[in-house]
Amino acid sequence: VRAESTVATQKYVWKNVKIEGGGGFITGIVFNPKEKNLVYVRTDIGGAYRSTDGGNTWTQLMSWVSFDEWNLLGVESIATDPVDPNRLYIAAGTYTNSWTNMNGVLLRSKDKGNTFERTPLPFKLGGNMPGRNMGERLAIDPNNNSILYLGTREGNGLWKSIDYGVTWKKVDSFPNPGTYIEDPNCPNDYLNHITGVVWVVFDPSSGKPGEGSKVIYVGVADKNTSIYYTKDGGQTWEPLPGQPTGLLPQRAKLSSDGMLYITYSNTQGPYNGDYGEVWKYNTKTREWKNISPMPAKDTYFGYGGLAIDAQNPKVVMVAALSSWWPDTYIWRSTDGGETWKCIWEWAGYPNRTLHYTMDISAAPWLNFGITSPVPPETSPKLGWMVATLEIDPFNSDRMLHGTGATLYGSDDLTKWDRGEKITIKVKGIGIEETSVAALVSPPVGPHLFSAIYDIAGFRHDDLEKAPSWTYTQPNMGSTTDIDYAELNPNFMVRVGNVDKKWNP
């Protein structure tokens, strides 16, 4: 019998099915202050991404994570080194509750995230827990980049590394690990956890290169005392005198002229919060000032995203975290928060004057099938859950802001100051962080149909292009499964979750 030749094994080439735009919550944006165009984003379930073109396109840095280590894909915080741009740190861990038994991991890279070394941490991290919108919890001392601080949850306090993140030790002198718990009686073990230490900000002017910074500010989820500072490089700590009470500090930034800006909400977020304020603290005169852009009586949301223009410390931007209707708010000030301009304003209800145009051509599905919006709403929206907002330190015209669905941005930001409209574009090209429940590929018709949590799913006519629309008839936020009839592939069924309050 003549032996048959062995059939060669076909080699497969794997690529992402393009969705573009992200499809999930962008929880943090961090520009490197030393290397132009280098920027990172973190997500709650989709890992971390790097851009080397200022945020136009992105590369996934955590595709190496195995199924067994799925918990690493929730990124609690991210830090890019202000001294050595090649160094990158990621605090990885998705849940601090009973949904996983995995502790967090500190990922260390010397090549901008191409490869990582890891340090196991003795506690859990919460990249997809309530308060993931706050930050950044992980920070590098600009006067000694071997020193890092990490704010943690669950009463674990503030931690410090003096060897580039290789080893960590708890800062025993730090007095407050946080007290805030949104709902102590939460039945599903999600809202009943301590939010903890939520951000760390160094004062570069308080030290010399190589010696470390003397002054450090730390934010804590505690409505009584939420901001602490040290004047001796972390040996002793005390509350910052005169600080606001009754609110939780979301984000903080220190401008080059010595102003500490803080956004506040009355809850941890990211979904809720019906009141907030914006404050600035003059670190030279030790004076506080409420610079909230909206009067207290009109505020129905908490504040989140915060940005300062590195080229002009008087330029400050803030965003509403929890304004869902009619849209989010973004404000811009060119005088240190004394006066503000909003990106839209009322023009006699239900009309609004918009100082921007939206371009979603890179991800047309971001209108979520709403082609004839009813005023005052528009489609697409500017966003929701805007926890992070950044101005490129090398380009005052470039802004990025994260939402619950995508990453948006502008390349003509300073037009706003001249009374002209700016353009907001999809900037999440390469970010794919959807939670896919099911896939089917019928023998005829489109290549692929997806069932996806939160954004319904898609008919993928071209795997190399973003879909034009999500499933809308009926409109289900999450599609949990999808299938077709074998004998009639054009007959398809999908099932999912519907919120009867919004879709009666």
What does each of the following model-derived ranges do?
Residues V1-P504:
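Extracellular glycan-interacting surfaces
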